């Protein structure tokens, strides 16, 4: 049995490093233009993407470059220039959706494998065969694909790798093919600037044909109903079925625009789940409780195990987002000596430490605070909040940009958190 690859989102260089340190075998990300994540100033530049690739390769891990937008004719020259620039960075694969872009990429950089984006909506063996004949090495399956169908595709095309999403946001539309945002905001999802209009609350009205009066059809508390809002995908409870099928080469986590803690926690838990499967020690209830520490829209196992018409639990009509069970109070700096405050933090309060895979945490007590272990979990208590500039406080809020000293160094990219609900 081949070990499955765990693939995590990398929205920027920091998240790339976090995901790799928390156990990802590979990460995916892109540089504006055609990567379906155009967030000015918040994503990679060519320089930082190259730095990320070099960082990953030094760890013997991989980086896949997303070039999965659907270009218009007016963009083809820019696309070609972009492909040449991305090829020079030497990513481990291109993730592409459009057949024409696949052919162009294969011409420009025949040595770089092509992975087919989920945006291509592959659901059957016939479509998979077409893209395989185009030279595609791996298909990122449509979220609507069932595991049984994935097994059939693998049987027909044993040399074709299949990748599935196991966690993250889901579109109301068919694998992201949506124009709601384009129509309402002028922001085109398939060019990387979706405004997430499906997450808004809407009100139903009916029009009286006799007098034109508009009447509200559904009465709800608040301002409306989230009629388009899909729950978040969570397949942590189905790792055994997925890996036992021997059809899946990679498990993918969605979320390039989500928080650093999200990148860390999802990678941490799915890394643990995959490793536990191979050691026959699966703990699905633990994975579920830990993933609930993240903000989410409610969870569903999507369509991999059951068809859409067999279920009525993929939508959340009540709210577009809910808080997780835990609040992140601090992010440890890369040198491990300080943390950046992300939420109100006080003295004499125990904060759980979430650290990268295999990171060592040494207990200590001094005048700043203590680091200790209790029931296999590590905690930090601050006796005083001492800023980098030596200012002393009893409480610090997220608006304070000064770094806070730790009693002793903690592993880079660790997090401090507290439980906010049971």
Curated annotation (Swiss-Prot):
GO BP terms: proteolysis; tRNA processing
EC number(s) on file = 3.4.-.-
Q: Which keywords belong to this entry?
A: Hydrolase, Protease, Signal, tRNA processing
Pfam families for the chain: Peptidase_U32
Q: Name one GO molecular function term.
A: peptidase activity
- Tell me which positions the record assigns to the signal sequence: 1-58
- Source organism, top-level taxon: Bacteria
Report the sequence similarity comment from the record: Belongs to the peptidase U32 family.
What this chain does, per the entry, is described as: Involved in prephenate-dependent formation of 5-hydroxyuridine (ho5U) modification at position 34 in tRNAs, the first step in 5-carboxymethoxyuridine (cmo5U) biosynthesis.
Q: What is this protein called?
A: tRNA hydroxylation protein P
Whichever gene encodes this chain, its name is trhP
